[in-house]
Amino acid sequence: MKTITFPVGYRPNYLLDFLHCLRKQNLEGWEIFCSVEASPQCIQLLEICDLKMNILHKPNSIGRQDHSGARANMYNALNSAFAAGSDFNLHLEDDFLLAPDAVDLANWYYENFKDKPLSYMSYGMFGFAPRGDDYTLLEEVPFFEGLGWCAFKENWEVCYQRAWWDESLAKKYYNAYGWDWNVQAYFRDSECKALRPLINRTQHNGRVGGTCCTPQHHDKHYAPLKWNQTERITEFKIIGVGGDTADRVK
């Protein structure tokens, strides 16, 4: 089973933009799991959307009484999908915009690596600044990018499920906190590799009211980025190794 997961918070305007993008994707053969905070407007949007989704309500017992927090909400979606039998998952967020071929890239990853899932630990959608003009190209990098990524069940069990709540390596390498820093530190400690497109297949849209991103940060680091808004690619090529951790912006 192939799955798509995403958390849902309290910003219906961004959720509506995201669902508009998601509905345009090639979703044949995919199950959708989303974990929802106690946001009536967002829950209503999901229920009236004509997508078949497993809508999970996140318990309020984690974090603040009225808000479980983004990390717990994401984990609930991911863990529920893999527990339900997912072999391969595309993880997105409710304040993303998606390229027309975002799920096509996920399908390509699945078809080309389903028999060797641990070739890479992350099969990514995003890489900050574009590197060239060829929409078909992918590159190998020695780090994790969190703005849209795919993982096989084996990747989930070996890396993400273990690292998600374990702060020890993030403190050791980065003196940082958060699920993505935990995963990044696991990549560094275990010398993991990832694939990512040279031109992004996701774009951050959540300028206001996010967990970490401020309007100033969004305007500086995300708004200027080139990402695929027009092309529909179904076949991709890996060109080699590129980038370094200097590409990453937090």
What are these regions (language model features)?
Residues 1-92, 96-250:
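Peripheral/terminal regions associated with large enzymatic or DNA-binding modules
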